[in-house]
C-alpha cells in the first residue's frame, strides 16, 4: 500500500499486548479511566488498526473482524478496512505535505490522528479534534462504503482544520461556513472526480449562484473560489488563510488583508473568478470538468420584461454580496 500498516489481529490476544511503533496514540479525556488494553472497553487497542499517521478504532459491537461483523437490526455493518487505511493515509499525506494544513511542531507529529468507527445505523460522519490535542473524526459504516471515501476526505479535512487551531496557529474566525467549503475543497483535491460523484451539489449551486459568498445554502456546493485562490496563490495558501483568520474578520476580510487588496480590486478579482468558473477554467481539473463547462441554464427564465422593452432580474434572483448570475 505504500505506507506502514498495523492491526491488532496480527498481534494476537496475549497478555503481552504491544502497541505499534511510531507515533503515540492519544487517549482522550472522555475515556479516562478506561482500560484500552481490555477488549471490554467501548474502544480498545485490540480493536485498533494503524497506519503511520492514523489510529482506526472500532466499537465493541464490530467484534474482531471489520469485514464480517454481526449485522445490526438486519443491516450489514462491514467496512473495507484495507481501503479505509489506504485512503486515510493518502488523504493525510496530501493535506499535510501538499496543502500544508499543519506546520512543523504540530502535535500531529507526536500523535496519530484518530478515526472512530461507531457501531450504529445513524448516517453521521463528522470531523474535529480530541481535547485540542489531536485531530479526529467519527463515522458509521454507511458513510464508509464508497471506494473513494468522499465523506472521509471531507471529515479528515475538518480534522486538519481543527488541528491547526489546536496547535495554536490562529482561531480561523472562530468558526463559520468556510469550514464546510474548505473541507469540500480539500475533498476535491484528493478526488478530482468529486463533481461526477456528487453532481447534485453542482446542479443545486447553479440555481443559487446569486446567493452570497459563504451563504449557508452553498457552503457544501461551492469550493470554486478556494480553487481559484489556490491556483493564483499556490496550494498551501488555503491552509494559511485558515491560520490567518481572526475573530472579528470574515474570510473575505482576511483575504483582502493578506493580499493587500482594496474593495474595488477584490470585486474585480471575484468577477474574474466567476468568469473562470463558468467554463471550469481550472488547470488542475480542466479536462475532467468539460461535461460541466458552460452548462448554466437559459437565464431568460430569471428575467421579467418591463413595459419599456427592457428586462429586469426577478427579485428572487438579484445577486447578494459576491453572488452572480450567468
Task: Report each predicted region and the residues it spans.
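Extended hydrophobic/Leu-rich segments
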Residues: 3-6, 31, 43-66, 72, ...
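Intrinsic disorder/low-complexity segments
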Residues: 9-11, 56, 274
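Juxtacatalytic substrate-recognition/specificity segment
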Residues: 50-175, 179-183, 193-196
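Beta/coil-rich, acidic/histidine-enriched accessory regions frequently appended to metallopeptidases
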Residues: 249-326
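Acidic/His/Gly-enriched intrinsically disordered linker/tail segments
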Residues: 129-130, 146-151, 166-237, 242-281
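Surface-exposed intrinsically disordered loops and tails
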Residues: 29-37, 65-75, 210-211
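N-terminal low-structure segments adjacent to metalloprotease catalytic domains
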Residues: 1-49, 308-326
Amino acid at each position: 500500500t505504500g505506507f506502514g500498516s498495523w492491526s491488532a489481529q496480527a498481534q494476537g490476544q496475549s497478555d503481552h499486548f504491544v502497541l505499534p511503533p511510531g507515533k503515540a496514540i492519544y487517549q482522550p479525556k472522555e475515556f479516562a479511566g478506561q482500560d484500552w488494553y481490555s477488549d471490554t472497553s467501548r474502544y480498545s487497542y485490540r480493536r485498533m488498526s494503524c497506519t503511520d499517521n492514523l489510529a482506526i478504532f472500532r466499537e465493541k459491537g464490530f467484534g474482531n473482524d471489520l469485514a464480517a461483523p454481526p449485522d445490526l437490526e438486519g443491516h450489514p455493518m462491514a467496512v473495507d478496512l484495507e481501503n479505509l487505511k489506504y485512503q486515510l493515509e493518502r488523504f493525510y499525506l496530501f493535506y499535510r505535505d501538499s496543502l500544508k494544513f499543519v506546520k512543523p511542531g504540530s502535535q500531529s507529529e507526536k500523535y496519530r490522528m484518530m478515526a472512530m468507527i461507531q457501531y450504529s445505523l445513524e448516517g453521521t460522519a463528522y470531523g474535529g479534534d480530541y481535547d485540542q490535542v489531536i485531530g479526529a473524526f467519527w463515522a458509521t459504516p454507511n458513510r464508509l462504503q464508497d471506494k473513494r471515501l468522499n465523506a472521509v476526505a471531507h471529515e479528515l479535512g475538518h480534522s486538519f482544520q481543527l488541528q491547526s487551531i489546536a496547535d495554536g496557529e490562529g482561531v480561523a474566525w472562530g468558526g463559520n461556513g468556510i469550514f464546510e467549503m474548505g473541507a469540500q475543497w480539500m475533498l476535491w483535491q484528493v478526488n478530482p472526480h468529486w463533481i461526477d460523484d456528487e453532481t447534485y451539489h453542482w446542479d443545486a449551486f447553479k440555481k443559487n449562484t446569486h446567493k452570497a459568498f459563504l451563504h449557508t445554502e452553498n457552503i457544501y456546493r461551492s469550493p470554486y473560489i478556494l480553487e481559484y485562490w489556490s491556483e493564483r496563490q499556490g496550494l498551501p495558501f488555503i491552509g494559511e488563510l485558515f491560520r490567518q483568520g481572526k475573530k472579528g474578520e470574515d474570510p473575505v476580510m482576511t483575504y483582502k488583508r493578506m493580499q493587500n487588496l482594496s474593495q474595488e480590486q477584490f470585486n474585480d478579482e471575484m468577477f474574474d473568478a466567476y468568469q473562470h468558473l463558468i467554463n471550469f477554467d481550472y488547470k488542475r481539473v480542466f479536462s475532467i470538468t468539460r461535461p460541466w463547462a458552460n452548462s448554466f441554464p437559459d437565464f431568460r427564465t430569471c428575467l421579467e420584461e418591463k413595459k419599456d422593452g427592457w428586462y429586469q432580474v426577478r427579485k428572487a434572483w438579484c445577486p447578494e454580496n459576491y453572488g452572480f448570475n450567468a
